[in-house]
Amino acid sequence: MAKKKLENLSFEESLNELDTIVQSLEQGELSLEESMTLFERGLNLSQLSQVKLQAAEQKVQILLDKNGTAKLTDFDSSAGES
């Protein structure tokens, strides 16, 4: 699989590539240099996935029913925290 630029990867593509990298590293058949290159790519993919997940979380809308009227409200990630 040709490596796409990180910014062009979807969330699912980044997770799939990250999974492939983990499997390759766990096999232990790579040189140190190859392992370090994959490890660095994996870290970047992990960070990208986290950013994309946070962006999606911010866009989530919750359907609230107030006084019998449906209303869309932006997701508030701090609403359940004490």
Swiss-Prot record:
One of its GO terms (cellular component) is exodeoxyribonuclease VII complex. It is an enzyme of class 3 (hydrolase). One of its GO terms (biological process) is DNA catabolic process. InterPro entries: Exonuc_VII_S, Exonuc_VII_ssu_sf. Keywords: Cytoplasm, Exonuclease, Hydrolase, Nuclease. Its EC number is 3.1.11.6. It is found in: Cytoplasm. GO terms for molecular function: exodeoxyribonuclease VII activity. It holds the Pfam family Exonuc_VII_S. SUPFAM superfamilies: XseB-like (SSF116842). It catalyses: Exonucleolytic cleavage in either 5'- to 3'- or 3'- to 5'-direction to yield nucleoside 5'-phosphates. Heterooligomer composed of large and small subunits. Belongs to the XseB family. NCBIfam families: PRK00977.1-4, xseB. Bidirectionally degrades single-stranded DNA into large acid-insoluble oligonucleotides, which are then degraded further into small acid-soluble oligonucleotides. This is Exodeoxyribonuclease 7 small subunit. It comes from Colwellia psychrerythraea (strain 34H / ATCC BAA-681). The gene is xseB.
